A protein has these predicted regions:
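Conserved functional hotspots at enzyme active or ligand-binding sites that engage polyanionic ligands
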Residues: 1-115
Length: 115
């Protein structure tokens, strides 16, 4: 499976205890030209917990937004660029959609990483 920056996917993502996993949506945030030779992706976790919205490192996706259907997300969600992970490709279950405008995500990443 070939995923690109801006793609949403369902992946087996570890719980905070690092012992169990849950199928969760993520957003691929790594540069497309990043070719490390390793079968992995850098992703931002996505949550449906809207209490996590409103921070400069997070981007809210509301289903009423005209671009929301292309994301493949099923409910209002928050992209958390302050919760990044590197996952192995074998943990990817499937792609579900994409975000066509990455400007807000890019700004959130700059806020998170101090760039």
């Amino acid at each position: 499976m070939s995923l690109k920056r801006g793609d949403f996917a369902l992946v087996y993502y570890p719980h905070s205890d690092l012992r169990t996993v849950k199928l969760r949506p993520v957003l691929v945030v790594q540069a497309e030209e990043l070719n490390t030779g390793l079968p992995q992706l850098i992703v931002a976790m996505v949550t449906s917990n809207l209490a996590r919205a409103g921070h400069p490192s997070r981007v809210t996706v509301l289903m009423k937004d005209p671009l929301a259907p292309e994301t493949g997300l099923k409910t209002d969600s928050v992209i958390m660029t302050d919760n990044l992970g590197t996952i192995e490709l074998q943990l990817v279950r499937r792609a579900i959609g994409r975000i066509s405008r990455m400007e807000a995500v890019d700004q959130a990443l700059r806020n998170t990483l101090g760039l």
